[in-house]
């Protein structure tokens, strides 16, 4: 039981960035579905937890950059979500298991992405499909639709494999039985009911996934362009793998200024209409208002005659700071602010600090970020901009909030410099691709050491920087005002459908159980005895 479950999780992990073998998600999901057949509740729970470990040990490996013991605890807790989902799947018959399994896994992921401490979308299986043919589904149902499609596709693969294997076994039995004598009333053994159930399950699941992908491809994508914006995302460059406390804030700011000055020189003094700087490249020991940095950034916006959006952290008290995106207009006026809503637990704040300080060294997080409450909309001369700071790009609700408030273009100032590997930067780019598609908006992302990127509303990556390099990524992006199905309805349709599917699966299982008891049978559709 253990090996198939762990292998399923590892295959799902390999579908995620930075590895990006998106196609592995389907046989891996199918392997877990197959393994749950006939298992007792405790064994299903154990199988799901092992699969979760196989997924999150590599998928969330970057968390060891904070603390290895803490990372192991986090991964063990995250693995409980697929464990509980597997517990919620009836072990038989095939139809009940096929109906409930994708739905239960999707509901578990919906909870994982929002709880505890605001959830953790990073590491979700939906990110692996940013590079696959199912990305268009995000227009219909966001990350949960992609998640549901992965698990449903897994059922299709496993059921098809089971049906083929059953057919091969049937042929072997037929050949071994030798010739028959119809005159003597002999008959060739027929296909088992389980084989037929598997074939039907595979067909239905495949049709569901393919039809969803086709519908997503032709669904509203944000509408035609209502205007273009020349944009530049500035990446100052520098070393990676160092915590904020190990880096001189002045050197980070100096690299950003140098990259921006070089851009202006190469452009002959003409700057694009919108310039985006990354998260936290202006780090202040006090408030921004009235500081030298505010004056310098105001002067820079005037000199470039551009809308300048900058990631700023300002200390507001002895225990708190704000993580903001701040916009200056072409005349140097500060025109908008957005405070980050989804804070990184144990990275930007410590929940229950008085408790955890007895268990771990919290010196790396001396202050707690003040949570923002805004929609993310910034009204600027470059147009209405929707801002998500850092890993908020993985939260579908942040982009949706901004678009519903009127945003015509999405911006993501982020900072992944603390991570030495490409895992977090690549997962953020994948999240940006999903975000752009589900909201129907072009998206510009800036990071001080990468990845800086530009993504279209159809999910096409127009440009991506080199990690660690000093670089300016430029593009002409479109502003749009149309809405996607996801912007209109959010996660509700997928959540309702998934909940109904789990209930229907258990109803089928109970009905089949009563029939077995009445007929004195032993199982349907390959369910077999409960182990």
What residue spans do the PLM features occupy?
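Membrane-embedded alpha-helical bundles of multi-pass enzymes
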Residues: 1-173, 180-181, 186, 191-215, ...
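Compositionally biased, intrinsically disordered/low-complexity regions enriched for serine, proline
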Residues: 15, 99, 176-179, 186, ...
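Short, highly charged, low-complexity non-transmembrane loops/tails of multi-pass membrane proteins
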Residues: 167-175, 181, 227, 521-529
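Compositionally biased, low-complexity segments enriched in small residues
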Residues: 176, 188, 518-520
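Juxtamembrane interface at the cytosolic side of transmembrane helices
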Residues: 503-531
């Amino acid at each position: 039981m253990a090996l198939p479950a762990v292998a399923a999780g590892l295959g799902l992990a390999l579908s995620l960035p930075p590895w990006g073998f998106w196609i592995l998600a389907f046989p891996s999901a199918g392997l877990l579905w197959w393994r749950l057949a006939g298992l007792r509740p405790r064994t299903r729970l154990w199988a799901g937890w092992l699969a979760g470990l196989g997924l999150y040990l590599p998928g969330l490996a970057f968390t060891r950059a904070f603390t290895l013991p803490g990372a192991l605890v986090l991964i063990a807790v995250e693995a409980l979500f697929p464990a509980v989902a597997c517990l919620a799947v009836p072990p038989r018959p095939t139809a009940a298991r096929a109906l409930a399994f994708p739905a239960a896994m999707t509901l578990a992921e919906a909870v994982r992405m929002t709880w505890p401490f605001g959830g953790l979308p990073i590491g979700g299986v939906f990110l692996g499909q940013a590079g696959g043919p199912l990305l268009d589904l995000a227009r219909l149902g966001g990350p949960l639709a992609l998640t549901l499609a992965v698990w449903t596709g897994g059922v299709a693969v496993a059921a098809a494999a089971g049906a083929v294997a059953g057919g091969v076994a049937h042929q072997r039995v037929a050949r071994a039985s030798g010739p028959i004598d119809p005159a003597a009333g002999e008959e060739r053994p027929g296909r088992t009911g389980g084989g037929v159930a598997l074939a039907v399950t595979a067909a239905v699941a495949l049709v569901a996934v393919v039809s969803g992908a086709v519908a997503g491809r032709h669904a509203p994508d944000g509408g035609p362009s209502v205007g273009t914006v020349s944009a530049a995302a500035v990446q100052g460059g520098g070393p990676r793998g160092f915590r904020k406390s190990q880096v001189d804030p002045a050197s980070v700011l100096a690299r950003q200024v140098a990259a921006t000055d070089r851009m202006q020189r190469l452009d002959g003094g003409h700057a694009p209409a919108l310039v985006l700087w990354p998260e936290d490249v202006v780090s202040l020991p006090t408030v921004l208002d009235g500081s030298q940095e505010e004056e310098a950034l105001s002067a820079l916006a005037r000199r470039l005659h551009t809308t300048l959006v900058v990631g700023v952290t300002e200390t507001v008290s002895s225990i708190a700071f704000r993580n903001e995106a701040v916009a200056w207009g072409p005349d140097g006026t500060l025109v908008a602010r957005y405070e980050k809503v989804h804070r990184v637990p144990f990275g930007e704040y410590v929940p229950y600090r008085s408790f955890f300080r007895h268990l771990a060294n919290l010196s790396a997080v001396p202050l707690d970020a003040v949570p923002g409450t805004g929609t993310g909309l910034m009204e600027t001369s470059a147009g209405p901009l929707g801002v998500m700071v850092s890993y908020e790009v993985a939260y579908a609700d942040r982009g949706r909030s901004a678009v519903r408030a009127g945003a015509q273009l999405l911006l993501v100032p982020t900072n992944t410099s603390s991570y030495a590997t490409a895992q977090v930067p690549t997962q953020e780019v994948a999240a940006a691709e999903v975000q752009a598609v589900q909201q129907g908006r072009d998206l510009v992302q800036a990071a001080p050491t990468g990845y800086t990127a530009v993504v279209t509303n159809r999910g096409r990556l127009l440009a991506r920087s080199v990690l660690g390099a000093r670089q300016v990524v430029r593009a002409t992006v479109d502003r749009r005002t149309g809405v996607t199905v996801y912007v209109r309805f959010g996660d509700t349709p997928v959540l309702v459908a998934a909940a109904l599917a789990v209930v229907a699966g258990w109803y089928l299982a109970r009905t089949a159980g009563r029939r077995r008891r009445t007929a004195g049978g032993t199982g349907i559709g390959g369910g077999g005895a409960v182990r």
